[in-house]
């Protein structure tokens, strides 16, 4: 990944969202008041715009199925968009976006495109319904076959991650002995 990846040296194409992704309502949709065991390991995803949409972690919920891992969630009323790596439960009005090519990195790239698309929706009369999502259009970089370039999107986001980590390490790394903390005695 030493080669500089640029968004500007790519061809881009408009895709109909519902033709590129399987979009469906969540499998669980549990009202928070009905949750049992609030000390578990399963993420409970809501329409919140913080913490990757995770409201809390819960135990297995008898009578409900988890949504599968490696998907993107969209909160209908709030237009929140997040990648979910483990299986999870959700609150109400969450849509689940699937594509077998998704991974942690290209999903982050796609999320940015989705956010550009859903920002036109609003709470109330013009929300992000399933029909509107399926008919919507997003632009993505393409490969030589005119298909989404999943590899480029992954590599691009990996590079962003590495650059961010490098900056964080450089920021926190002591530059000389005077900057190091010393203990009292």
Where are these regions (language model features)?
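Non-catalytic DNA-recognition/assembly elements of restriction-modification systems
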Residues: 1-27, 35-52, 144-185
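DNA target-recognition domains and sequence-specific DNA-contacting regions of bacterial/archaeal
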Residues: 13, 18-137
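A generic structural motif
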Residues: 100-101, 140-146
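An amphipathic, hydrophobic-aromatic interaction surface with interspersed Lys/Arg
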Residues: 135-142, 154
């Amino acid at each position: 990944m030493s080669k500089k990846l640029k968004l500007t040296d790519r061809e881009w194409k408009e895709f109909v969202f519902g033709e590129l992704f399987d979009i469906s309502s969540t499998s669980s949709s549990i009202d928070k008041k009905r949750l049992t065991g609030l000390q578990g390991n399963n993420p409970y995803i809501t329409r919140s715009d913080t913490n990757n949409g995770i409201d809390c972690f819960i135990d297995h919920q008898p009578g409900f199925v988890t949504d599968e891992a490696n998907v993107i969630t969209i909160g209908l009323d709030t237009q929140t968009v997040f990648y979910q790596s483990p299986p999870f439960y959700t609150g109400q009005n969450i849509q689940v976006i699937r594509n077998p090519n998704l991974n942690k990195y290209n999903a982050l790239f796609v999320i940015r495109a989705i956010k550009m698309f859903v920002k036109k929706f609003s709470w109330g009369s013009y929300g992000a319904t399933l029909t509107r999502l399926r008919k919507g259009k997003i632009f993505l970089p393409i490969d030589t076959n005119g298909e989404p370039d999943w590899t480029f999107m992954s590599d691009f986001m990996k590079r962003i991650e590495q650059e961010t980590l490098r900056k964080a390490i450089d920021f926190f790394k002591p530059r000389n002995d005077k900057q190091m903390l010393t203990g009292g005695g």
